[in-house]
A protein has these predicted regions:
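Long amphipathic alpha-helical segments
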Residues: 1-60
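Predominant activation on well-ordered alpha-helical scaffold segments within soluble catalytic domains
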Residues: 1-2, 17-20, 34-41, 81-84, ...
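Short, glycine-rich nucleotide/cofactor-binding loops
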Residues: 4, 92-98, 170-176
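Gly/Ser/Thr-rich loops at beta-strand to alpha-helix junctions
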Residues: 29, 92-93, 97-103, 125-126
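Short glycine/proline- and acidic residue-enriched helix-loop micro-motifs
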Residues: 62-70
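A short, well-structured juxtamembrane/interface segment
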Residues: 71-88
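Nucleotide donor/acceptor-binding cores
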Residues: 90-91, 116
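Conserved phosphate- and dinucleotide-binding cores of soluble alpha/beta proteins
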Residues: 104, 111-115, 121-220
Length: 220
């Protein structure tokens, strides 16, 4: 938004639409981003027909982006507080790949002095689990780290397993990092509660119409 150079309202809207098209051309179908871009396009359309009243469209657009950022921050904060209630003192908590919502849950548990331990797992192809390992360690949580082949070895003894989500459908299907399904099966085998930490930005409204959720494929 800070790169917008146009000064006339119509030109500003055209420039915003151009940026949205550029992002859509190169991004994988990550739902929170898609929802963000949809709100940007709604802003330009409302401005074009006059339902969005503003003297400075560029400033109004920046305010919209800040509003969205604040909404997302509030959602993550609430997830952290609700999720940490599930954790008791000295529980072992397992997680897979990288999730800001899951990390917020762990941060809250540490802040509440619950002295937890953790098990984290590597996720391919981008090795997101290494980032999770670093972030958990920085919280001062003792953590055991392994690849997905060690799920059956390291998950037993955990009180719960948390993952984030890429998308959630109207039928309750959860799309997450490859390997999450294996983790769910292991938890089912050992009777360990398995939780998905996500807010409504991960819900795909097109699934209400029967459209399948697009798989977010990433190159190895």
């Amino acid at each position: 938004a800070n790169e917008i150079r146009a000064t006339e309202p119509k030109d500003i809207m055209t420039e915003i639409e151009g940026y949205v098209d550029s992002v859509l051309a190169v991004t994988s179908p990550i739902l929170p981003l898609i929802h963000l871009l949809n709100r940007c396009m709604c802003f330009t359309e409302e401005s074009a027909v006059g339902t969005q009243k503003c003297s400075d469209p560029r400033e109004a657009f920046l305010e919209l982006l800040e509003e969205i950022r604040q909404e997302q921050r509030q959602c993550v904060d609430k997830i952290g507080k609700v999720g940490s209630r599930l954790i008791a003192r000295r529980d072992k908590v397992a997680t897979f790949s990288t999730s800001g919502s899951v990390m917020e849950i762990l941060k809250n548990a540490v802040t509440e002095g619950k002295e937890i331990t953790a098990a984290a797992f590597e996720a391919r192809p981008n090795s997101e689990g290494y980032r999770t390992l670093q972030e958990i360690s920085e919280l001062g949580i003792p953590v055991t780290f392994g690849c997905d082949a060690l799920l059956c070895k390291l998950v037993p003894g955990s009180k719960m397993f948390f993952i984030g989500a890429d998308a959630i459908s109207s039928t309750g299907e959860v799309y997450a990092k490859t390997g999450s399904y294996l983790a769910a099966l292991v938890c089912s085998e050992f009777g360990i509660p398995f939780y998905v930490a996500a807010d409504t930005s991960k819900f795909d409204p097109l699934s209400l119409l029967g459209f399948p959720i697009k798989d977010s494929l990433r190159p190895a």
